[in-house]
Structure formats: C-alpha cells, structure tokens
Amino acid sequence: MGTKKVKISSVKRAAHLKSKKTPLSKQQQQKQKQKRDQLKSKREQGQNIFSQKARKRDNLAQRKKHNKLASLGLDPLEEDNEDGDDEMLENVADMLDGDDLALLQANKRKRKAKTTGENDPDQGQSIGLERAYASDTKKEQDAQKIKLDLLPIKSRDGQIITRTTEVDYIPKPKQKKKNEEEEEDDSEEDGDTEYEDSDDDVVNDVEAATAAPVQKLISTTDLLIARQQEIERQKYRIGIICSGLLEKPEDKMRNFHALYELMDEINPASRQANLMAVRKLAIISVTEIFKDILPEYRVGQVDTKMQTLRKATLDRVTFENALLQQFKKFLQKLEQITAQVNRRGGLRTPQTVKLATVAVQCMCDLLVAHPYFNYVQNIAQLLVYMLNCNYAEMRTAVHQCFRTVFSNDKRLEMTLFIVRRINHLIKTKQNNVHVECITCLMGLKIKNVNLDAEKENELKQKKLESHRQRLLSLSKKERKRRKKLTEVNRELEETRAEENKQAKHQKLTEIIKMVFTIYFRVLKNDPTSRVLSAILEGLAEFAHVINLDFFSDLIDVLNRILEDQDELGYRERLHCVQTIFVILSGQGEVLNIDPIRFYQHFYRNMLAVQAGKNHDDFAIILRTLDEVLVKRRRNMSQQRLMAFMKRLLTGSLHLLHNGTLATLGTIKQTFQLTSVLDNLLDTDTTIGSGRYDPELDDPEYCNAASTALYELALLARHYHPTVRRMAVHIAHGVPATGEGALPTEIGKLTSHELFTQFDSTQMAFNPTIPLPKAGQPKLKRGKHLYIRSDFKQEYGKLLQQGKVSQTKDKQTLQIDFFSALQ
C-alpha cells in the first residue's frame, strides 16, 4: 500500500485529524487488507491472461489487415497506428468478464495527442529561435544589476542629496517539487496517510542550506542589512523550535541539537560563524525552556533493562533520562563559554565577556528556579568561583542570585553547600577576595536562632525515653501502667514531631558556625583586608547569635581595630561600635565591660554622615542609637544622654528630610521613655554647670545640660510639612493630645519606618506636592520716583513742544510718562 507524503502545517494537521473518520478496529483493518490483497492478485492474473491471449489475436488480426491493405495499394503502417489501439481494446473486452472490464476502464489512460509539425522546417526554426531568446534573456538576468536606495545625506548648504548604488541581481533558487502520484482504487481512500510536520524544515534550516553562497565584495550597508535579516530569520527559527519543545517535549528532544548548534561559535551544520546576538538568544531561549519543563524533584537513575516497568512508567523514565542528558549538555556548553574569560590564557574580548555574562545570568536563573534538580550543585560551585571574578557585572548577578537562594531556601541544603564553598574559596585565596564574597552572606536568615535549644531538646528526649523504659519494667497494675504509658507515648510523639525542625535547626547551626569561621579568620589573620568593612557589617547583623564564650575576645579585637588603625573609615568604625553594643545589649549584659571608650567613638563619628553620597549610611547610626539610647538608657548618665540628644539634633540640620524625620523620631521616643531630657527644652542656661562645648569628643564632659535644643526653632520652619509638625511636637514636650500632638498615622511610626517611608530617592515626595493654582499673573502698574525735582517740569516742556509721543503698548511694564505728567 502506497503512502502519500504531504507537508502541512500543525493547524491543518489538527483540523484534518479532527475531521477524520473514526479509526477502524483491528478486525476491520485485517478484512480490508485481505480484500486488497485479493484484488491485487486478481489484477495480476488478469494482466497475465491479457498478455498471453491478446498477443496471438493481435498478430493474426495484423496479418489479415496488412494483406488487405497491400491488395488495395495502401500503406499498412499508417492505418495500423491509427486503429491498432481501438481493435486491441475491443478484442480484450471480449475476453474479460465484467469485474475485470470495470477495473481496466477505471485505470486506462487517455492517448496522448499526436504532435503535429515534427517534420515542418519552419516550426523547428521557430522553436530554435525561442530557445535562443530564452538563453540570452537568462544570461542578461545573470549579469543584470539592480539599484538600491541608500540613506540620504545633508550638504553644508542644507540640501538633501539622495544616494543609490548598483548591486548584482541574484535570482532566487527554484525549489524542486517532487509530486508522487499513485493510482489507487476506491477501497484505498480511507487508508493510512503519512504526514510530515512543516516545522522540520525550519528546525533543519533548509532555507540556509539551499541558499547559494555569494562570494563578492559588498558595501557596509549591504552587510548590515544582511546581518539584520539573518538575526530576524534566526529569531523566527528559535521561536518555532522553542514552541515545539514547550508544546510536547517528549517528541521534540531532538530539537535541542539545533539550539546547541546556534550556541557554538561555528555552526557545525552550515560551517559558518554564528552571530553574537543569535548565540545570546539561543542561550536565553534554552534557559527559559529548562525553567519550564524541568521537574521540581530530583530525577533518579532507573535501569530499564534490569527492571520490568509499565508502559506509562517506561515512557516517563525514558523522557526523564533524555531530559537529563540534554540538561547536562547545556551546562557543559555554558561552562565552556564562561571558561574563556575565567581561566588563564582565555580569549577575553568584549564580545566574549558579554556572552559569558549572559551565560552566568542564565545559570543564576536555573539555580533560583530549580535549586534541587540534578547537576544544580555543579552550577552553584561554578557560580561561587564566578563570585570572585574580575567583572563587576558577573559578581553582581551571582551576588543577587545567592541572596535570593538564601532567602527562599526552606530545606537549607543548598544554602549550606554554598556557604561551605564560599568558606573554601576565601581560605584558598587567603582572604584576598572581592567584597561580594562576604556581603552575599547578609542574605542568610539566621536572626531568630537559639543555639542552646538544641541541647535542651536532646536532654528532654533522653529523659522521656528513660522514663518510658522504667514504666515498661514496672510490676504494678496493668491499667495504671497502660495509662501512664499512653501519656509518655504522647509526649514522645510530640518530641519526635519536632525532629524535622531539629534537623533544620542543625543545618542552620552548621551554617552559623561556617559564617563566623569566615568572619573570625579575617579579623584574626588579616584585619587590614579590603573586606573588613563587610566583615564588620556582618558581625553587626548577626552579633545576637554569637556564642557567649567569644564575647570578651571579640570586643578586645574590635577595640584594637578602632584604636590602632588610623586609616579606618567612618563606616567601619560605626559597624564596630554597632557590633559591640549589640553584644552588650543581649547576652553580654552579664559581662563586666565598661563601654565608655565605645561611647566616645560613636559620639565622634555621629556627624560624619550628611546629605550627600553617604546619606544612606545614616541607617547604621539609627540602629546603633536604638541600642544605645533605647535599650541601654538606664546604664547611661544624664550628662551623656543629654550630649547625645544635642549632637543628634545638631546633625539633623544637614540631613535630608527622611534622615531628619528619623532623628526626630528617635528623640521623641527617648523623651517618652525618660523625663531627664525636659531640661533641654528650657532656655534658662543657669540650670547646668559650666559652658557647653560642642566640639569636645567626650559626651560626659561637654556640659550639654547648660544648653537647649535651639535647633527645634529652625526645624519648625523646615520645607517638609511633617518635619515641621514633628519639631513642634517635641518643642511642646511630646504631648499625647492637645496642642502640638501628632496625628496617629505619624506618631505610631518608628525611626526606621520614618527613614524608609519618606525617602525621596525614587523621585516621589511624601506627601505629594500640591499643584500650583491655575491663573494668569496680574500686571501691576509701577509708580516712578523722580530723583531730580525739576525733571518733571523739563519733561513737560518737551511734551508741550511735541518732541515726545505717547506709548500705545499697554502690555509692557514701562512707565507711561505722558499720562503721568498730564
């Protein structure tokens, strides 16, 4: 049975399958096949009978006819050619039965019309002229040139000059159409038909294979046009391939090969260089495909030869194995691209760096989307080394990726793996790494961790187990023993229900140990490292989970850094002070440590932040103020507390409005917690002793009680309305109700919320600035004042003589002297 190969699109194929008749059962198909075989054998037998009998009858009839025509003097060949076919059909019709005759009539072909004029010399000459003309026209078209319009240019005189150029005419190659027509009877109309998807031509890039290579000199404009056309063509091709993969990935796994060819520098199929834009598109497209079709679970290895599987399970396992192989091949190609810029002696051109950046970003996307799929740990290991590369854009991408993984990882397995690899990298490089290797650890969620809870749970479980064993060995009454045993089993089950939490807590504890190992190694071995600022920031962030045994040594190290290193910046100093006060405000309260020297460091660096590039660093001061003025206010003397209030309000004058609001919020909270600061609202300077020295760095001896908060008068006329209301509120003694009270929506905000909500770095002013009122400005007529008293008289004489005329322009602001002197 012949098959008909028809190329149709997916839409037509779906419509054909939809409108196709209901498929036959197996028995009906077997009967139909037997019927076709019988019909075919009968046809062959009929042809054999026809060939044997017709040959004898034909020879006899021809001999009789030849003799008759020869007796009449005619040429027997001409008549034979005309009537031979008709006599043959008549003779055969007599021999065949009804079924064979119907079959032959259905399959007979019409006789071809006899060509006339073969021996006519004029007609042959005309045919030769036509062929010569066609060949000459083809040669002219081959050598023909067409005109292309170029971009116009503008001359110095301002004239637009159009430009054209001539390029050789290249005819489009004609595609050969192969139409296979086979004759079938009516019983074969419902047979199977083989269809070929039209997307195969796009996947195999038939258009590029059939295009004739052009080897000639071309202009820059033609080159750019050809490049853009190639990009658009490959865009369309990539879209077709990706849509097929997303539609049914089980049947389209071979399409990955076409995308991998576009990722290479040289296309293996066409042996031509791929454009850089096409390579980037191919990498991004494959990444998006894997993000969609990869499963959330880890694919296991199943040996289909040793195990007997069901058909559905076998199909799934086959698909997963093929998908895993394609994913592995894709990761190998990405690793080859990044190795060109990461290894020594690699090709580090701007194009390869950009391509490697795209590859790194794609690996980051895969790590975030599927952190526990196969081979993803290899991605994480490669990205850890890219975190210390020499390209800031790649480091930023990996840094953001790791922070996202740390915040979204609930199982903590990938987080622990990444932290271990970072620790190994820093140890191998001897702390000579980029800052991103340390700052990415700030995304870890280890703020609410109790390291002593693990030991308590272990002791509790051991006690319950021993108590259960004692109850089982007792020889009391059965009912009483069963009752107690039930209660103990219930408590034991509750303890076992927390095993998952304990396993997670154990991983979190391991992460904390690894992080502080990194921090303490840098502080001990290389305190002058360029990552010291990031180390101190991390210590300030996670100081509440540091073990109590390390507190004394850590405070001594930080104090030595503050005093010995003169080149230490204000940011590092603020982080040191913040870390120390976080330690002392928590479990470090039991330590006998006097933080007076750290008060002086903090008081000295409070004015380092201003409304400029470092204004965002004021958040560090806010966090430290929360530890110093709020949590440790009872451990501070009145003089020190007043000195901090005065310096804080002085520093608010050269901050942006959100920093000023955060400062006033801290002062308001401190005023509400203590009544000692009410003396600063009194302008009587005889209360304190001595004179206030604002330049003294020791807050204990600057005599802040001898001054007042005069800055509130300036802030009451601030450009921001909320600052004005807050300053008036503090000046009235922070009343809850009455005159000077704040609205509820402002009074409930903390200093950190005020600093964030009123931030205008995104070009959004809070509250919204009202629009100006619409209207035209009124022109005010001015009044002239004469310096010379006799000027009016002299000008009046000129008017009388007619030498000065009256002005008619009423829209100007000039003085009309004529009307003024009338």
Curated annotation (Swiss-Prot):
Where is this protein chiefly located? nucleus
Q: What is this protein called?
A: Nucleolar complex protein 3
Q: Which GO terms describe its cellular component?
A: Noc2p-Noc3p complex; nucleolus; nucleus
Span list, region Disordered: 1-86, 106-142, 172-199
List of residues that carry Phosphoserine? S187, S198
Chain's gene name: Noc3
Motif Nuclear localization signal extends across 41-48
> What molecular function does GO assign, one term?
chromatin binding
Query: What spans are recorded as compositionally biased (Acidic residues)?
Result: 76-86, 181-199
Cell compartment(s), UniProt: Nucleus, Nucleolus
Q: Which InterPro entries match?
A: ARM-type_fold, CCAAT-binding_factor, Noc3_N, Nucleolar_cplx-assoc_3
Write the record's keywords in alphabetical order, separated by commas: Coiled coil, Nucleus, Phosphoprotein
For bias kind Basic residues, which ranges apply?
13-23
The protein's organism comes out as Drosophila melanogaster (Fruit fly)
Gene Ontology BP annotations: DNA replication initiation
Q: What is the lineage of its organism?
A: Eukaryota, Metazoa, Ecdysozoa, Arthropoda, Hexapoda
Pfam families xref list: CBF (PF03914), NOC3p (PF07540)
**Comp. bias intervals (Basic and acidic residues):** 35-45
The chain residues annotated with the modification Phosphothreonine are T193
Entry's family note: Belongs to the CBF/MAK21 family.
Knockout or disruption consequences: Ubiquitous RNAi-mediated knock-down is lethal between first and second instar with reduced larval size. Conditional RNAi-mediated knock-down in proliferating cells of the eye and antenna imaginal discs is viable but results in small eye size and disorganized ommatidia, possibly due to excessive apoptosis. Conditional RNAi-mediated knock-down in cells of the prothoracic gland impedes pupation, probably due to reduced ecdysone hormone levels.
